[in-house]
């Protein structure tokens, strides 16, 4: 059995690491595995190929603002990717996150469909069934064709008249007529949304939770003590916020700033780890650390914290939550599916509250930080659900089932 994954990046960001973990996990299980990716650094690793130049991807990023078509891009990169597909002749193609201006999504889907290649599609975000935006929020235009998109500029970075409706129609056409396609949302909520979309509702769904490297993300007691001393936390409760971008409005950094003002600085300290090194506002009252120096240090931050706080407006299945739980630290989070939490998480260790309710956020953070479960117990609960080993095993089962189905 030969599996070929396609993702925008490799070994970078959440989807890049997931793609890497599946690739290496399959190889360890003696499954023939290949990865094609389009953005960032060129990786020197067996079976991993970069298919698009940064120049072409960036050029089409700009051009797509004029055309309004962010998924009909990069002809040379697309041709390179399709040629590699022909050369590799995989039994199953696994599509991860394929936005990022490195491939023409419609051409890729039509190629897979025309050549009857069994395909697994992981839904990390919403754009594959909205046809446009990564998060639809309260908008329901994606259910009927995006004819009156209220947020087109934010959704596709273009104001071209009718662009959202065109994109939706093209995505629907590209998905029509697949012989063997299975959808793998990363959470039940994403899967439920996909069943409401005319683009994807006709295909079978199997939720596969993301997994992380629990050899890295586990409770690190010694490193935690060293880090708390380094940060001069003392006897205070350490409130951790890990974010890809503190200044991104969707990530809710403003709520962390307000939380830092509400908490007694003699009893609590808010610590921010920010992937983009965006400094918080001047009125932030805590420790802004910036980007962690590698995965091991990030695991030490989770291990050192008394509670991890998530304040995003929308998330599908945030990797930070998986990492925190596997390091033994409970989570306080706004509902990241509107008015819903995520049933995939062990309820005992993840505490959801209504978005924007600062009184309840403050009270819950205080309570959890002072009465949290023993670290090792929380860590073990996380490992049972979110380890990369479990994720790879689940995907292997799906590959085999899909391949058998296609040959019957």
For the regions a protein language model found, what residue spans apply to each?
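A short, active-site helix/loop in glycosyltransferases that binds the activated sugar's phosphate group
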Residues: 130-134, 158-205, 212-216
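Nucleotide-activated donor-binding/catalytic signature segment of Leloir-type glycosyltransferases, i.e.
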Residues: 274-296
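Conserved donor-binding/catalytic core segment of Leloir-type glycosyltransferases
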Residues: 184, 232-251, 257-260
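Short hydrophobic beta-strand element within catalytic cores of glycosyltransferases
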Residues: 330-333
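Aromatic "clamp/platform" in nucleotide-sugar-dependent glycosyltransferases that forms part
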Residues: 313
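A short, well-ordered alpha-helix in the C-terminal region of glycosyltransferases
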Residues: 373-387, 394-397
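Conserved acidic donor-binding segment of nucleotide-sugar-dependent glycosyltransferases
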Residues: 350-358, 367-372
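Short alpha-helical donor nucleotide-sugar binding micro-motif in glycosyltransferases
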Residues: 300-305
């Amino acid at each position: 059995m030969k599996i070929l994954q396609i993702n925008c990046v490799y070994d970078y960001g959440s989807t890049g690491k997931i793609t890497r973990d599946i690739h290496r996990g399959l190889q360890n299980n003696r499954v023939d595995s290949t990865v094609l990716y389009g953005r960032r650094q060129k990786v020197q690793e067996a079976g991993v190929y970069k298919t698009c130049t940064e120049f072409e991807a960036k050029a089409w990023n700009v051009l797509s603002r004029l055309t309004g078509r962010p998924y009909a891009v990069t002809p040379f990169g697309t041709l390179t990717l399709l040629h590699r597909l022909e050369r590799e002749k995989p039994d199953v193609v696994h599509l991860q996150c394929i936005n990022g201006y490195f491939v023409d999504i419609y051409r890729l889907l039509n190629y897979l469909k025309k050549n009857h290649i069994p395909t697994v599609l992981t839904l990390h975000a919403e754009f594959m069934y909205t046809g446009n935006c990564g998060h639809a929020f309260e908008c329901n235009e994606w259910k009927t064709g995006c004819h009156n998109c209220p947020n087109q500029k934010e959704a596709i970075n273009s104001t071209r008249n009718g662009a959202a409706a065109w994109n939706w129609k093209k995505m629907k056409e590209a998905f029509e007529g697949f012989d063997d396609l299975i959808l793998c949302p990363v959470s039940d909520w994403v899967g439920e949304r996909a069943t409401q979309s005319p683009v994807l509702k006709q295909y079978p769904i199997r939720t596969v939770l993301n997994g992380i490297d629990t050899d890295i993300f586990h409770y690190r007691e010694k490193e935690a003590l060293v880090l708390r001393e380094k940060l001069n936390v003392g006897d205070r409760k350490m409130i951790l916020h890990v974010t890809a971008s503190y200044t991104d409005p969707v990530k809710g950094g403003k709520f962390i700033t307000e939380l830092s003002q509400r908490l007694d600085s003699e009893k609590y300290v808010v610590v921010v780890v920010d992937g983009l090194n965006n400094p918080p506002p001047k009125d932030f009252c805590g420790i802004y650390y910036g980007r962690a120096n590698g995965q091991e240090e990030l695991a030490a931050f989770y291990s050192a914290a008394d509670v991890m706080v998530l304040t995003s407006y929308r998330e599908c299945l945030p990797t930070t939550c998986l990492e925190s739980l596997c390091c033994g630290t409970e989570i306080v989070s706004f509902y990241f599916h509107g008015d819903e939490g995520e049933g995939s998480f062990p309820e005992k260790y993840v505490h959801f509250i209504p978005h924007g309710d600062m009184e309840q956020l403050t009270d819950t953070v205080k309570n959890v930080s002072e009465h949290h479960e023993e670290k090792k117990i929380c860590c073990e609960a996380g490992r049972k659900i979110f380890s990369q080993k479990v994720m790879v095993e689940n995907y292997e089962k799906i590959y085999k089932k899909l391949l058998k189905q296609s040959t019957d």
